[in-house]
Amino acid sequence: VHWSAEEKQLITSIWGKVNVADCGAEALARLLIVYPWTQRFFASFGNLSSATAISGNPNVKAHGKKVLTSFGDAVKNLDNIKGTFAQLSELHCNKLHVDPENFKLLGDILVIVLAAHFGKDFTPECQAAWQKLVRVVAHALARKYH
């Protein structure tokens, strides 16, 4: 994947302002609320019975932070995203059996969360760069699937 200097700048400038805990928790909560079938991968997380329960669930918050922290590794390694996510791809494929389509859904939700948090700073050009990034990350995570 080729990244232009402008794309890299747009991605890193937003990433530098992201509150990983808040945005990660919000993104994962939105995934579980908007696409309820994804909840089956989080049965051990406890109460996921309503939007309020999901948004307040400490396990959702903690895992959301973990997910977005990993996403930060992509931002730091834009030229080697496949390598960066090789182990996570194997884990999600072979051990957790996560539907790889869910990576695309979460990526799209992350773009929505960033747009909501950054408003006019999240320009269409910025959105395009982030949309490209979430697609590349989703593809890297789905790589170990057969």
Curated annotation (Swiss-Prot):
SUPFAM superfamilies: Globin-like. This is Hemoglobin subunit beta. Heme b binds at residues 63, 92. GO terms for molecular function: haptoglobin binding; heme binding; metal ion binding; organic acid binding; oxygen binding; oxygen carrier activity; peroxidase activity. The keyword Heme applies. The keyword Iron applies. Residues 2-146 form the Globin domain. Heterotetramer of two alpha chains and two beta chains. GO terms for cellular component: blood microparticle; haptoglobin-hemoglobin complex; hemoglobin complex. Belongs to the globin family. Involved in oxygen transport from the lung to the various peripheral tissues. One of its GO terms (biological process) is hydrogen peroxide catabolic process. InterPro entries: Globin, Globin-like_sf, Globin/Proto, Hemoglobin_b, Hemoglobin_oxygen_transport. Red blood cells. Keywords: Heme, Iron, Metal-binding, Oxygen transport, Transport.
